[in-house]
C-alpha cells in the first residue's frame, strides 16, 4: 500500500465516522509567534483544546505537514544516519474537542489498524500511563488486548502537557513489533527498549486535566482527544520495509538522485547517507519555501538555510559540482503534488530560490572547508579533538557555516565542537552591537509604562476621525517617574484620556504636534504606543507649567497627511509587487514616515529595471483611478476568510482593522490612511536593494516629495547636458562619444607609460650588482604611484631574467618600498622576509608573498638607507 493510499484511507475512515477533514495548516503557524514551525497535528487546533475557539465541528482529522529542525525538536544531526529521523514528515491525526473520549479513540485506532489496514494483532502492543487503569481496562476488556501486551510507563513517556500549566493528560501508544531480527538481541528486549524492534506508530493523548501553578490536577469539564500517527512510519509497516527511506515516500526521490549522480543506492554507506540526507532535506526545503520561508540568518529562515546547506554539502560529497537540490524539486512534487497542489503551482519559484541559495553557498564552501581542514590538522598535531568556539564563529560569520554543519563535517574525524565557546563569541558580537547603539533610557521608562498599564491607565485613540482633541492629562512623567507638574525646559511624557496622536506601531512613525493648556505649551516630538491601548506623548515644555489633571488641547502636526499618503501607498506597493513578482512576496518590515516610505519584502533576486517600472505604473494607475479607501473592524477569522493580507508571525487580537483600497488591496492594519487613492498624488521608487539573503528593500516617495525628486532629476539632466555641450536632448549619445574618446586616450597613455618604463628600466639596469651569485637591483624610481612601481618592477624582473628587484618611491610625503624576487630564487630569498626587515627603517610595516612584497612608511628620507641595506640581506 503506497503512502498516498494510506493517507487517503486514514482521512476517509474518520470522515465516515463524523470527522471534518481539515486541510493541513501552513508550516508557519498562523497567529502563534511562539512556535517556530508546525510540528504536530494539534498545532492548528490549539485554541480549540484551550476553549478559546469554537468551530462548527467537534471532531476532526487531518494530515499535517510538520518540520522538526530547531529548538526543542531538533533532529537535524541524525537525519540520514538513522532509519526514522526526518526534518519534514506528515502526521495523521484525529481529534475530539469535548466530544468522544478514551473508549471511542481507542476503538477507532484499533479498528483502523487491525481491520482497515489489516495489521496482525499479535504484533501490536500498547502502553498506558502508570495510573491510567481506565485506558488499560478499555484496551483489555473492549478491544481484547491481553494484559501482558499492555505496558505501563511513567510521566516521562506517557503523560502529555501543553506547558507547565494548563490542559494535560495521560497518553496511550501503540507499538509494532518489527521482529527479533532487527532488535538488540537482549533476552530482556521489550516495549520501551531503545532498539528498533518495537516501533511506536500511534499516540493517543487524553486531555482530561487542568494543571494549576501549584501542580494540582483538576478534571476538565469536557475532556478532549489528540492523536498522531506518522505517515512515514506506518508506511514502513504496510510496505514491509525496515527504514522510512525504503518506502515509496522516499524511494522516488532517492532514485532521482541516483539518476543525477550516476551512483547506486545501497552500494556505499557513505553515499547512502548523503542520498538520504538530500532526499529528506529537499522535502523540508520544498515545503518550507512553498509556505513562505526564505533562507536567511535568523529565525525560521536560518533553520531553512541550515537544512539547505547541509543538503548542498552532501551533494558535493556525492560529486556534484553544480546546483542539484533545485533539480530534485520535481521528484518531491511528483510524490506530494496530489495531496498538496500548492507545490505544483509554485514549483518554478521554489526551484529559483533553492538554486540562488546553492550558488551563494558554493561561493564560500570550498574556502570554508579549507579553513576547517587546516584547523582539524593543527588540532590533531596538538592531540585535541574539539573545534574551538572561535573557529566555529569564523566559519559561521565569514563563510556561512552553521555550527551543526561543521559538527557534521568533523564527525568522521572523531571531532566534536565547542558550542559554549561559539555562543560566547556570538554574545560578544551581540554585546558590541549593543555598545554601538546608544539608547536614551527607553528600557527604564518602559518599566514605568508597564506599571501604569497594570494600574489600569489607558488611552483612547480618536485620530482616525480627527486631528484634534480636548482631554485631561491623566499621567505626567519626567525622567521616567510620575510627577505632579513640569515647567518650561522639562522633557516630559504625557498620557491623556483621549488623543488624536498616532503612537508608533505597525511600521508607521508616531505623530508630532502640540499639547496646550491654559498655562502651558508642549511641543510633542514623538508618540509611543507601548501597549495597544496606551499612547504616550513625548516632548518638551516650551512655555509655562503643565500639571496632572489639566485639561488640554491636543493638535497633530500637518505631517500626518504625508504619513497617511505614504502608508496607503505602501499597501498599493505590496499589491503591485505581488502582481509583478509573484505571490511569494511577503512583507518583512516597513517604515512609514512623512518624508518617505520603506518596504522590505521577500524575494530571491534583484528586481530588473523593467519590473521596477511596472510596479510604479501599477501603483500610479491605482492612484489615478482614485478608488475609495475604507477601514472597518471585524473578527480575525472573518478577515482571514475574505482574504485580507496579514503579517506572518504577528500576534493579532480577536478583533482586527481591515483597510481596503478598492479591489486592489486589503490588509490588516491599524495605521492612518488617505480617504481615496488619488490623495496620494504621485508615487516614485527611489531605490531597490538587497538587505539580507532573500529580502529586498524598496524606498519610495509620494506626493510633493515625489514631484520634487523628479524635478531634481530634470535639473541634473539639464546641468549634465550643459557640461557635455549636448543639444536636442542627446545626452546619452554625447556621453557615449566622450567615454569612447576617454578610453582611447587611456590606451594611448598606457602605451606611452609602457615605453617610458622600458626606457627607465634600461637606465636602471646599469645599477645592477651581483651578490653571492644573485643579480640585485636596489634603487629609487622616478614614479609617484605604488601601482606604477609594481609595473616597473615587473618590467625589470623580465629584463633581469633571474634576480632581486627593490624599488622605492615617495607619494604624498609617504615612503613606498617594493621588493620582487624571480620565481627561481624564492627557495633562497623571499620578498616577504626582505620587506619585513627593511620596513622598520622607513618607519612602517609591510608584508607579502615570496615573489612580491610591499611596505609603506612615514620616513621618506630613509628610503636610500633601506635600499642600501638590500644587498647585505641577500644570502
From Swiss-Prot:
Its main location: cytoplasm. GO terms for cellular component: cytosol. Zn(2+) binds at residues 567, 571, 669, 673. It catalyses: tRNA(Ala) + L-alanine + ATP = L-alanyl-tRNA(Ala) + AMP + diphosphate. This is Alanine--tRNA ligase. It comes from Geobacter sulfurreducens (strain ATCC 51573 / DSM 12127 / PCA). Consists of three domains; the N-terminal catalytic domain, the editing domain and the C-terminal C-Ala domain. The editing domain removes incorrectly charged amino acids, while the C-Ala domain, along with tRNA(Ala), serves as a bridge to cooperatively bring together the editing and aminoacylation centers thus stimulating deacylation of misacylated tRNAs. SUPFAM superfamilies: Class II aaRS and biotin synthetases, Putative anticodon-binding domain of alanyl-tRNA synthetase (AlaRS), ThrRS/AlaRS common domain, Translation proteins. One of its GO terms (molecular function) is zinc ion binding. Keywords: Aminoacyl-tRNA synthetase, ATP-binding, Cytoplasm, Ligase, Metal-binding, Nucleotide-binding, Protein biosynthesis, RNA-binding, tRNA-binding, Zinc. Catalyzes the attachment of alanine to tRNA(Ala) in a two-step reaction: alanine is first activated by ATP to form Ala-AMP and then transferred to the acceptor end of tRNA(Ala). Also edits incorrectly charged Ser-tRNA(Ala) and Gly-tRNA(Ala) via its editing domain. It is found in: Cytoplasm. InterPro entries: aa-tRNA-synth_II/BPL/LPL (IPR045864), Ala-tRNA-lgiase_IIc (IPR002318), Ala-tRNA-ligase_IIc_anticod-bd (IPR018162), Ala-tRNA-synth_IIc_core (IPR018165), Ala-tRNA-synth_IIc_N (IPR018164), Ala-tRNA_ligase (IPR050058), Ala_tRNA_ligase_euk/bac (IPR023033), DHHA1_dom (IPR003156). Its cofactor is Zn(2+). It comes from the Bacteria. Binds 1 zinc ion per subunit. Belongs to the class-II aminoacyl-tRNA synthetase family. Its EC number is 6.1.1.7. PROSITE patterns: AA_TRNA_LIGASE_II_ALA. GO terms for biological process: alanyl-tRNA aminoacylation; negative regulation of DNA-templated transcription.
